[in-house]
Amino acid sequence: MVKDYVCVDIETSGVRVKWDKIIEIGAVKVRDGKAVDTFSELINPGLKLSPYITELTGITDEMLKDKPFIEEVLPRFIEFTGDDVLMGHNI
């Protein structure tokens, strides 16, 4: 059984893979069954969110307007996860 892993939750601007963007990455690093570290970043998708996505996630355009783009966040996330197994739903 895997004892060291990272649980990941990703929020997006929609479900259309070609057009929609990641707006939040959240993760918890687990060591021997215990949470030891967290990662949480809001991401500016460079597009306006639909009212549906705002209602679903609680994330607004105002919250994202001054946040970094994915190109800045992704290297930090990769560093956080390292070589760990990633776990998540529908990722």
Predicted regions and their residues:
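Conserved non-catalytic scaffold segment of RNase H-like nuclease domains
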Residues: 1-91
